[in-house]
Amino acid sequence: MSKNRLPAYPALANELRTASLGINPAELQGLLTGMLSGGLSLNDKSWQALVFDYTNDGMGWPIGALASAEQILLAMSAQLVDTDFELSLLLPEGEGEEALFELADAVAEWINHFISGLGLSGANLKHASVEAKEALEDLEEMSKLGIDEEDDLAEQAELLEQVIEHIKACVLVLHAEFGVKPEQDTKPTVH
């Protein structure tokens, strides 16, 4: 079960920064979750080349960072097909005003990279159901939200938590439509 756990945000942020990769943990998880939700199979290793192209001008990643990305991919794959319908988003945690602004930025980055991941995986969004199109529109709108310094920050923190829950629901709708279902993700036959 430990293989299905997400890495800790601060440790992964440090690992990505040390590797000079232009992506943060929220963006990476959003990208990989979008790719899975768009139909990427765990048996398809093309995700690595797509991630390298998208984040590092086609150059490979250090082994540690790649292992962390694979850990995220495995964890999210398990969460997306779990009957509990629970998703864990890899977002920064903290207290105070600065942490709230950082969280809001990370949420927007997560969504934008999720949408990019859908596109990279080749999801045919033009032929999506009404529900899937609405979920995608909601995500696009939520990616534009921000924190207003003039308003009550406690109230905005609560609203941001509601937005995060709605993001999860939208992701599950899109994965239900485009993602590989467990019975579709079969292992190759060995002779």
From Swiss-Prot:
It comes from the Bacteria. SUPFAM superfamilies: YgfB-like. It holds the Pfam family UPF0149. One of its GO terms (cellular component) is cytosol. InterPro entries: YgfB-like, YgfB-like_sf. Belongs to the UPF0149 family. HAMAP family: UPF0149. This is UPF0149 protein VC_2476. It comes from Vibrio cholerae serotype O1 (strain ATCC 39315 / El Tor Inaba N16961). The lineage of its organism: Bacteria, Pseudomonadati, Pseudomonadota, Gammaproteobacteria, Vibrionales.
